[in-house]
Swiss-Prot record:
Pore-forming subunit of the mechanotransducer (MET) non-selective cation channel complex located at the tips of stereocilia of cochlear hair cells and that mediates sensory transduction in the auditory system. The MET complex is composed of two dimeric pore-forming ion-conducting transmembrane TMC (TMC1 or TMC2) subunits, and aided by several auxiliary proteins including LHFPL5, TMIE, CIB2/3 and TOMT, and the tip-link PCDH15. This is Transmembrane channel-like protein 2. Keywords: Cell membrane, Ion channel, Ion transport, Membrane, Transmembrane, Transmembrane helix, Transport. It is found in: Cell membrane. It comes from Homo sapiens. Residues 69-79 have a biased composition (Basic residues). Detected in fetal cochlea. InterPro entries: TMC (IPR038900), TMC_dom (IPR012496). Residues 135-147 have a biased composition (Low complexity). It catalyses: Ca(2+)(in) = Ca(2+)(out). The lineage of its organism: Eukaryota, Metazoa, Chordata, Craniata, Vertebrata. One of its GO terms (molecular function) is voltage-gated calcium channel activity. Belongs to the TMC family. Residues 1-263, 358-431, 530-693, 772-906 are cytoplasmic. It is a multi-pass membrane protein.
Length: 906
């Protein structure tokens, strides 16, 4: 390239010199300017000589005198001619200079283009060798005088934006992975290479800083999202269970995790606003009777049997209602503990109601937004289920098991949709199953009521055994343990789909637990009314005892009055603490029964089947007893009703929520271990939604039913006179009215009184019901419209598929017909060409010999003319278009039978 450029330069210089020597008018150098000046001097000297010759002629012919007018006129004319010649010479010189400059500029551009093309790869190789940043190389090139034009910058900017869009949309491209990686690397290299050229100086540095911070921010958000995913408790355990047991079993553990989070918030609310202020700022233990163990109970207050029944020191601790004092303010902060206790009790139900409804709403929105379709279910699972980013063998095994389980779920759904059944037999069996279950529910309710009534008689006796003290809790736990399997056995008669059967099973167990719980509450309320009647007597006895004590003691001004120890003061029964103790016992006994059932019914059963199967008479794994399946309905309903007891009992026992948090925490680890080690998947696995909206609906109903007894005790029953933060008041809600009157301005009290008017509350409730009805109708209409649109989309998809299939068949048919027609047309064209061209003498002789050969008939030797009418048909002279026979011809590459033969080489 350099030799060519040098040759072009030498040729250009030689041409310039030649033009200067020849005195051509197109020279463009200093020599040209000098030559033009020489020509101007010659031109100036030429008219002088002409003038001399003319003067000689004039003198010879009689020229005018020097001062004559004719002499003056000729002088003026000569002067004008000289000025015109000078102006023409200057104009010629300027035009020649412009032409020379233009030629020099075009020559420089022609010689600079190959130089620039050669310098670009040199510069890139140099930058690669030095391994310097791209921005420094661009800055050095800009400082060297090679700045980019505006058009080039615009082109670079456009290409950079295109590459960025390609990087952003790389995931959605239907390309192979190798092509994606190649294109991604090339796009990233291009962006890094040319992005810095869009700025200069400080602007360039600011742009680079912004890009760096943007990349850092994207990386931080990605890492933070990964961190949040890792912070989700028990997520990997639940995914492991889902991969082996299906989404139905995993839905229980998701629900258990959600319940743990709700109880953790409730525990923080109660512990931070009620228990901690009373312990830190309230009166210490032993200072007043309600915080002191009675003298008669001090001897056995620390025995294990007493503490196990939540008596002794536990009864007079901050875990229960009776420990809290009724002082309006406590401590140096003047903390209003009674008001805080009341508001926290109300807030527990308010927060639970809001969080349950919000969770149901979010799950509903997520389920409607998914838009799942039943088209090509198995194809989608087969070709799109695997995650290609898995790099761990254990994770790959879990994913494999999860895909297998999802196939089983889809197969069950397909079988159930295509199943035919005897409708009359099915109806009879379902009616029989419901009758048996109703009998079981009535029997369990009567049994609980009978046991509670008998426990009231045991409470009046002195020497009571451990079973008689805990008979109610034991009976309720046994009913909760044995009734769900009985219901499941009866439900086998109904032959429902597994998902529908689970809902019926949950509803029946829900009715069982609800009946047991409300039977227990009714019997407990009878006990509460008896204790309230006894409190009036104890209250009068206490007052008379203190009056006689102080009157019978002799004292004067010099002798102080003997103090009465808090342990010796007579006290009432404190029915709120008694109710809290009953709920505490129920919670602990239910937890123990659940753990014992898992150990005996699942773990020991699995060990027996596993190790005794080799030496037993029959196959223990396939027959009786076999491995246990995870009881979804029983565990879910047990969790829901345990939470209902927590909601009811937390008002009377603030420490109950903390015990429930520990119970849920241990249950998660214990049940996860038991499921993975002792249980097997269900024989008929089925798909369950991870949203758990059915569970949430049951939980919302239990929350509403748990609110009713607490609201009844707050609004109707008088509190105990000697224990709890509401002692000394007629009703518990009086603390709210007292706080408004003493701590708020008068007009706020009037506003609260107006808002509490039943004439305003009842219309507000009716308006809320109307709004709920309206929104429900709107949601139903929208769901129907959504279903119709989905059907329309499905129909359009089927029509489009049918059109595509028809079009594909047509194109396939055309593609099959096209080669035949093309070959046929080519043959016909060749025939036409041969007919139009006159054959040579040798060819005509050969044709005549073949036509006259033996064994050849006239029809066989006849050439078939093309069938298409648009092709030209040549006929020999003497044969018209209407003649009856064609000439006897045969092409040299066509056999007598009409089949094409291989053409001989020339």
């Amino acid at each position: 390239m350099s030799h060519q450029v040098k040759g072009l330069k030498e040729e250009a210089r030689g041409g310039v010199k030649g033009r200067v020597k020849s005195g051509s008018p197109h020279t463009g150098d200093r020599l040209g300017r000098r030559s033009s000046s020489k020509r101007a001097l010659k031109a100036e000297g030429t008219p002088g000589r002409r003038g001399a010759q003319r003067s000689q002629k004039e003198r010879a012919g009689g020229s005018p005198s020097p001062g004559s007018p004719r002499r003056k006129q000729t002088g003026r004319r000569r002067h004008r001619e000289e000025l015109g010649e000078q102006e023409r010479g200057e104009a010629e010189r300027t035009c020649e200079g412009r032409r020379k400059r233009d030629e020099r500029a075009s020559f420089q551009e022609r010689t600079a283009a190959p130089k620039r093309e050669k310098e670009i790869p040199r510069r890139e190789e140099k930058s690669k060798r030095q391994k310097k940043p791209r921005s420094s190389s661009l800055a050095s090139s800009a400082s060297g005088g090679e700045s980019l034009s505006e058009e080039e910058l615009a082109q670079i900017l456009e290409q950079v934006e295109e590459k960025k869009k390609l990087i952003a949309t790389m995931r959605s491209k239907p390309w192979p992975m190798a092509k994606k990686l190649t294109e991604l690397r090339e796009a990233q290299e291009f962006v890094e290479k040319y992005e810095g050229a869009l700025g200069k100086g400080k602007g360039k540095q600011l742009y680079a800083y912004k890009m760096l911070m943007a990349k850092k921010w994207v990386k931080f958000k990605r890492d933070f999202d990964n961190f949040k995913t890792q912070c989700i408790p028990w997520e990997m355990k639940i995914k492991d269970i889902e991969s082996h047991f299906g989404s139905s079993v995993a839905s229980y553990f998701i629900f258990l995790r959600w319940m743990y989070g709700v109880n953790l918030v409730l525990f923080g609310l109660i512990f931070g606003l009620v228990i901690i202020p009373e312990v830190l700022m309230g009166m210490p233990y032993g200072s007043i009777p309600r915080k002191t163990v009675p003298r008669a109970e001090e001897e056995k207050a620390m025995d294990f049997s007493v503490l196990w029944d939540f008596e002794g020191y536990i009864k007079y601790s901050a875990l229960f209602y009776g420990y809290y004092n009724n002082q309006r303010t406590i401590g140096w902060l003047r903390y209003r503990l009674p008001m805080a206790y009341f508001m926290v009790g109300v807030s527990v139900f308010g927060y639970s109601l809001i969080i349950v409804i919000r969770s149901m709403a979010s799950n509903t929105q997520g389920s409607t937004g998914e838009g799942e379709s039943d088209n090509f279910t198995f194809s989608f699972k087969m070709f799109t289920s695997w995650d290609y980013l898995i790099g761990n063998s254990e994770t790959a095994d879990n994913k494999y098991a999860s895909i297998t389980t999802s196939f089983k779920e889809s197969i069950v759904d397909e079988q159930e949709s295509n199943k035919e059944e005897n409708i009359h037999l099915t109806r009879f069996l379902r009616v029989l199953a419901n009758f048996l279950i109703i009998c079981c529910l009535c029997g369990s309710g009567y049994l609980i009521y009978f046991v509670v009534k008998r426990s009231q008689q045991f409470s009046k006796m002195q020497n009571v055994s451990w079973y008689e003290r805990n008979e109610v809790e034991i009976v309720m736990s046994l009913l909760g343990m044995f009734c769900p399997p009985l219901f499941e056995t009866i439900a086998a008669l109904e032959n429902y789909h597994p998902r529908t059967g689970l809902k019926w099973q949950l509803g029946r167990i829900f009715a069982l637990f609800l009946g047991n719980l409300y039977t227990f509450l009714l019997a407990l309320m009878d006990d509460v009314h008896l204790k309230l009647a006894n409190e009036e007597t104890i209250k009068n006895i206490t007052h008379w005892t203190l009056f006689n004590y102080y009157n019978s003691s002799g004292w004067n001004e010099s002798v102080p009055r003997p103090p009465l120890h808090p342990a010796d003061v007579p006290r009432g029964s404190c029915w709120e603490t008694a109710v809290g103790i009953e709920f505490m016992r129920l919670t602990v006994s239910d937890m123990l029964v659940t753990y014992i059932t898992i150990l005996l019914g699942d773990f020991l059963r699995a060990c027996f089947v596993r190790f005794m199967n080799y030496c037993w008479c029959w196959d223990l794994e396939a027959g009786f007893p076999s491995y246990a399946e995870f009881d979804i309905s029983g565990n879910v309903l047990g969790l829901i009703f345990n939470q209902g007891m927590i909601w009811m009992g937390s008002f009377y026992a603030p420490g109950l929520v903390g015990i429930n948090v520990l119970r849920l925490l241990t249950s998660m680890y214990f049940q996860c271990w038991a499921v993975m080690s002792s249980n097997v998947p269900h024989e008929r696995v089925f798909k369950a939604s991870r949203s758990n909206n059915f569970y949430m609906g049951l939980l919302l109903l239990v929350l509403f039913l748990s609110l009713l007894p607490v609201a009844y005790t707050i609004m109707s029953l008088p509190p105990s006179f000697d224990c709890g933060p509401f002692s000394g008041k007629n009703r518990m809600y009086d603390v709210l009215q007292e706080t408004i009157e003493n701590d708020f301005p008068t007009f706020l009290g009037k506003i609260f009184a107006f808002l509490a008017n039943p004439g305003l509350i009842i219309p507000a409730i009716l308006l809320m019901f109307l709004a709920i009805y309206y929104l429900n109708s709107v949601s139903k209409s929208l769901s129907r419209a959504n279903a119709q649109l989905r059907k329309k989309i499905q129909v359009l998809r089927e029509v489009e598929k049918s059109h595509k299939s028809v079009k594909g068949k047509a194109t396939a048919r055309d593609s099959e017909d096209t080669p035949k027609s093309s070959s046929k047309n080519a043959t016909q064209l060749q025939l036409t060409k041969e007919e139009t061209t006159p054959p040579s003498a040798s060819q005509s002789q050969a044709m005549d010999k073949k036509a006259q050969g033996p064994g050849t008939s006239n029809s066989a030797s006849r050439t078939t003319l093309p069938a298409s009418g648009h092709l030209p048909i040549s006929r020999p002279p003497g044969i018209g278009p209407d003649s009856g026979h064609a000439p006897s011809q045969t092409h040299p590459w066509r056999s007598a039978s009409g089949k094409s033969a291989q053409r001989p080489p020339h």
